[in-house]
Design a protein with these regions (language model features):
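A short acidic (Asp/Glu
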Residues: 68-73, 155-164, 187-191
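Flexible, glycine/threonine-enriched loop-and-boundary segments that flank and lead into catalytic domains
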Residues: 27-61, 140-145, 149, 157-165, ...
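Non-catalytic, compositionally simple segments
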Residues: 1-58, 67-69, 85-130
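Acidic, metal-coordinating catalytic cores used for nucleic-acid/nucleotide bond scission
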Residues: 148-157, 182-186
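Acidic two-metal-ion nuclease catalytic site recognized across multiple nuclease folds
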Residues: 248-273
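Acidic, metal-ligating active-site segments
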Residues: 66-80, 238-240, 246-247
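Short, surface-exposed connector motifs at secondary-structure boundaries
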Residues: 138-146, 171-176
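Metal-dependent DNA phosphodiester-chemistry modules and their immediately adjacent helices/loops
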Residues: 104-116, 165-257
Length: 273
C-alpha cells in the first residue's frame, strides 16, 4: 500500500488517513509528471484547432481578478475512445506582466507568447473583452455544448454577457453554467480528472504551459475527504488546470459523458429486510 501511495495521489490520501491517522485538512502534490505524460500520444500531438472544427466539446473558464492569468479550456470527447478527451485551451495575461520585474515567471511568459501558447491583452489588467471575443469565436468554430464559469465576482458580468449571447442548447438548458469554487463543486470532477490522467486518457499534446501548471497543483483535502486544486505559492499558476477540471465537470454531467462505476462517487448501498 505504501508503494502504491507514492505514485497514486488518491491512494496516498487514503493511506495517510487510514494507515497514518493523519486526519484534518491535508495538502499533497496532485500528480507526478511522468503520470501526466501518459496522455502524450503521437497521434494526438500537438493538439490543433482544425481537426477539432465542428466537434462537440465542453468548456471551463477560470477568470483572473485583475492582473493574473485567465484560462479557457475546451475538452473534446474522442471519436475513437469516448472515455478519453482531447484538450485545447487558451491562456491570457496582461501585456505588462511580461516586463514586470516582480513577475518571476516573465521569461517563461515571453517564451510561451513566442510559441503561441500564451496570449496577451493590452495594458496592466486583464481585458475581459478579448476573452469574450475569443470564446464567442470558439463557439462558432466548435460545437460547445456547455461551459462552466466561476460564479463568484470575477465571473458575474462576463458570465451574464456570454449567457445572453449563447442562450440555450438543444435541450433547452443554459449553455453557460455558474460553478462554485469550493470542495463540493470540485470533489467529483477532480476524481474524474485523476482517473483520466492515470489511464492516459487526457490527450494534451505535451503542451508546455499546461504541464508547467500541472507540476504546481496540490490537492487540498477537507475533513470529509473532498479534494480541490490549490497551489503552494502565489508565483505558481494553476489556472489552466482549474479550467480543465471545470470543463470535465460539464462533460461528466452530459449524457455523452464518461461511464463510471456506481461505486466511485455514490459508495455502497445497504438493503434492510
Amino acid at each position: 500500500e505504501a508503494r502504491e501511495a507514492q505514485t497514486n495521489p488518491a491512494k496516498e490520501n487514503n493511506f495517510r488517513r487510514y494507515r497514518l491517522n493523519q486526519w484534518g485538512q491535508q495538502v499533497t502534490r496532485w500528480m507526478p509528471l511522468h503520470v501526466w505524460d501518459l496522455g502524450l500520444h503521437p497521434e494526438h500531438s500537438p493538439i490543433t484547432e482544425e481537426p477539432l472544427r465542428g466537434r462537440a466539446c465542453f468548456g471551463g473558464l477560470d477568470l483572473a481578478a485583475v492582473s493574473d492569468m485567465t484560462a479557457w479550456m475546451l475538452v473534446f470527447p474522442c471519436d475513437e475512445d469516448d472515455q478519453a478527451i482531447d484538450v485545447l485551451f487558451r491562456c491570457w495575461v496582461p501585456e505588462a506582466q511580461l516586463t514586470n520585474p516582480r513577475n518571476k515567471n516573465r521569461h517563461l511568459y515571453e517564451q510561451w507568447v513566442r510559441d503561441g501558447l500564451l496570449r496577451i491583452t493590452p495594458g496592466t489588467t486583464i481585458d475581459y473583452s478579448h476573452i469574450k471575443a475569443a470564446i464567442l469565436a470558439d463557439c462558432q468554430m466548435f460545437d460547445v455544448q456547455t461551459l462552466a464559469i466561476d460564479r463568484l465576482f470575477q465571473g458575474q458580468q462576463l458570465g451574464q454577457e456570454l449567457a445572453d449571447e449563447l442562450g440555450t442548447g438543444p435541450d433547452g438548458q443554459p449553455r453557460v453554467v455558474a460553478m462554485g469554487m469550493g470542495y463540493l463543486s470540485f470533489a467529483s470532477p477532480m476524481k474524474a480528472v485523476e482517473k483520466l490522467t492515470l489511464e492516459g486518457r487526457i490527450h494534451h499534446g505535451g503542451n508546455g504551459l499546461l504541464r508547467w501548471q500541472v507540476e504546481h497543483v496540490v490537492t487540498r483535502i477537507d475533513p470529509a475527504g473532498n479534494a480541490k486544486p490549490d497551489k503552494e505559492r502565489s508565483s505558481e499558476k494553476i489556472d489552466a488546470f482549474v479550467s480543465l477540471v471545470m470543463a470535465v465537470d460539464q462533460w461528466t454531467r452530459h449524457p455523452s459523458g464518461p461511464v463510471e462505476s456506481a461505486y466511485e462517487n455514490r459508495g455502497v448501498a445497504f438493503l434492510s429486510y
